[in-house]
Design a protein with these regions (language model features):
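Metal-ion/cofactor- or nucleotide/acyl-coenzyme-handling active-site neighborhoods
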Residues: 1-171
């Protein structure tokens, strides 16, 4: 479904998932929700929040967008302590099993969510998580406002999250 697919068997490593917490990149839009047992924590595209104390010991999946292959992906992988360019295996990150998924930069659901004609990494990750887990998805740090990045169509993305899933806590 997304470029270098992970195997479905890797996702079976995450058992007893009762909800998914997807972390975006807006620290001012914070629910301060502490991950509880059964929460699968997913950080997408940006690695800054992997060092925020609230999540320091609990990032299970880092989803990267393939379009940033040289400019962003390698430094991001290095920053969170994962081996450079090895994107389909599991690693130990702060005593947690961390799988890194390399996502293709085009969405196969025909949703053109960014002004550049590409789906955002967040929405790709959202669809991917929905495909494998039938649990509520909480978005942390996604405001739905458009000031942060001019290439994102934030209102379209905001609407799509609600249209395609059981989403709560978008501030």
């Amino acid at each position: 479904m997304f470029g270098k697919n992970i195997s479905e068997s890797m996702l079976t490593l995450f058992t007893n998932v009762s909800q998914i917490l997807m972390i975006a990149n807006n620290p001012n839009c914070s629910s301060m929700m502490r991950p509880t047992p059964g929460t699968l924590v997913v950080r997408f595209n940006h690695c800054e929040n992997t060092s925020v104390p609230l999540y320091r010991n609990k990032v299970d999946i880092l989803a990267l967008n393939g379009q940033y292959h040289d400019l962003y992906e390698n430094p991001c992988v290095q920053k969170v302590g994962l081996p450079k360019l090895v994107l389909t295996s599991s690693y130990n990150f702060n005593n947690h099993n961390t799988s890194t998924y390399h996502l293709d930069s085009k969405c196969h659901q025909m949703l053109k969510l960014s002004k550049a004609g590409l789906c955002t990494t967040g929405f790709q990750t959202f669809l991917y998580m929905r495909r494998f887990f039938a649990v509520p998805i909480i978005l942390h740090g996604f405001s739905g406002r458009g000031a942060e990045h001019p290439r994102h169509a934030y209102q379209q993305e905001y609407s799509a999250y609600h249209r395609f899933g059981n989403v709560s806590n978008i501030c």
